[in-house]
Amino acid sequence: MMVRIKVSHLIFLIASIIFIFISPYIFGDYGLNIVNQIAIFIILAVSYNLINGVTGQFSLEPNGFVAIGAYAATLVLLSADAKNDQFFLDGPSSFILAIHSNSFILALIVAGICSSLLALILAFAVFRVRGDYLAIVTLGFGIIIKIAAINFPSITNGSRGLVDIPQFSTIYWTGGIAIVAVILILNIVYSKYGRAMKAIRDDEDAASAMGINTFWIKTLAFSTSAFLEGAGGGLLACLLTTVSPTQFDFLLTFQLLIIIVLGGLGSTTGAIIGVILVIGGSEWLRFLDELNIKIDSLNLDIQSTPGLRMVVFSIVLILVMLFARKGIMGYYELSDVIRGIKKRFKRSKK
């Protein structure tokens, strides 16, 4: 597949590289941590958008693949001594004990491959169904992965999780990999495979009648999405330096769903905008979780309500679905917006 660089893509690339290199100088530790989270969620969102938005398959599996990637990368990076120290109740299996590498890139590749291989196997089951049934099957997959993480302590250390993971996820790694992920997804979207994915989204039966191998194309989108979600999970583990089953519940999938719907299903640019609004906004609205309101004259006493900010985002999602059903960008990309501005500018000059 030939790499295509449009003017808008070049602008995005240059602006992103500049932002990555100046971030350590303009943000404190807390701000830099949020920027790292945004970069990782961009990877997760654009990859999830490939299967859900571009290909039109209503899948609810991201938390499962992110969990697999996080655990796979962690088990590669932890030394044998660190594993023995942490698996103090149920010793690690001999295979888990033997796995070790200090290579961060290798750990991310292993994380991506593990998720992608499982996606290939899962595709034979999930793509026998469509629509709501597909959503239910993939939702079940995420739940199974979380339960497996709890009930296989010799592999995952169970509910105790794993800690002291090397913190490799600096802004240079997370930002750089996010750029690579975005460029990869954009090149897929604008390739013949991307056109086939869009045809399946618009009308799968018609796409099949035109000679498109719908199962193969959906599997390609699913496995590519899973690879990036797995790598993103590895990055997340190395940012937080800890993994546990509770980190990978359905809330993660729901958050990604809000992001791509808000930005516009099928738009990579929209997914990026959605990440900035949701992740950045959720940090800005963190005060809502700790909000205490007491007005004696009204006999009103509201104590802190954990999760209130997610209620706010749920309301935002409902409003978007009601008044802007295609999201902020719809199906459009940054290049389409620039093209539209150029056309209007030319018309105004005539």
Short names for language-model regions:
Residues 1-350:
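Transmembrane alpha-helices and adjacent helix-loop boundaries
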